[in-house]
């Protein structure tokens, strides 16, 4: 089982590859701040699917699941990633 903080760091790493100009470790709303758009969310999903061997459905690709680091980690937990 991975620690919550370790998962957060891995998600930050994936996000930083997608949008290196932003600091995703901040407690901000990524969507409202313009840090992620819909294409970025799809790219993030592909990275998360590959990293954690999970499948995030299209129905889950909504701003409510990707607007903060904690929400992304919670989605991973719902998809079966052991945290």
Feature roles, as predicted:
Residues 1-23, 74-83:
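Thiotemplate assembly-line natural product biosynthesis machinery
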Residues 16-35, 54-62, 83:
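Phosphopantetheine carrier-protein modules
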Residues 42:
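Conserved catalytic core of two-component sensor histidine kinases
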Residues 60-71:
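AMP-binding/adenylate-forming catalytic domain of the ANL superfamily
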């Amino acid at each position: 089982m991975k620690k919550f903080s370790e998962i957060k760091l891995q998600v930050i790493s994936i996000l930083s590859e997608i949008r290196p100009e932003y600091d995703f470790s901040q407690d901000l709303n990524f969507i409202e701040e313009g840090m992620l758009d819909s294409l970025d969310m799809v790219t993030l999903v592909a990275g998360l699917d590959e990293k954690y061997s999970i499948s995030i459905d299209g129905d889950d690709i909504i701003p409510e699941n990707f607007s903060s680091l904690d929400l992304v980690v919670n989605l991973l937990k719902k998809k079966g990633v052991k945290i």
